[in-house]
């Protein structure tokens, strides 16, 4: 399946092949659970299945966050990618900051690299991008200094895109994620949310990943992660109205239904 990432209302369903996801919905190495979740996504019309084998929950908030090796990560994600690719015609993204994991995932059928590191973790990721033609999700993940949050995010993203272009990477392959929850305080996340508009990012495809993030829990007074469904959907709809077009969601099936109904009413 060839997915146009400039299309409106693209929904990415989260499939955590982990046991320590902050949202508590990881399937671990259970292929049956993974396929059941993926089938639900596909049947509901969810556009992308995002498979990740390493928890990205912030160490500053959650205890017991341990980095996993490439081998550990591969042992989790590859069997699941194989199973999804064998059973469903759906776009798959690999959620990894490691180039060797991303490369192997691509060999097994992943279409998109979803890297939260902003190319700061693995220097070989650029080399992988040079020898493949897969889309790459560039996530802002850099400490915010003084000044407007949105301005620094845009500047940091633009610098990284310019560097990628100098390396021969076609900008048409790039999807931008403004990086809610990564290297940002609660106040900075809220400011970014309030001031977000896709025009500031030169009309690149924009992926939003606010789903169940801790800053939404703070502003809605929902410390329980399972109680953040409504605020997560409200956040995504607000950012949709500001030009975002790809939405990484834990409750992807519900969100797909909601935006489909909205389309019927317009």
Language-model features, listed with the residues they occupy:
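Structured loop/turn residues at beta-strand edges in well-structured enzyme cores
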Residues: 6, 44, 108, 169, ...
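Active-site-adjacent loop and "lid" segments of alpha/beta metabolic enzymes
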Residues: 21-40, 56-79, 83, 88, ...
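N-terminal amphipathic alpha-helix/helix-capping segment at the start of soluble metabolic enzymes
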Residues: 1-22, 162, 167-171, 260, ...
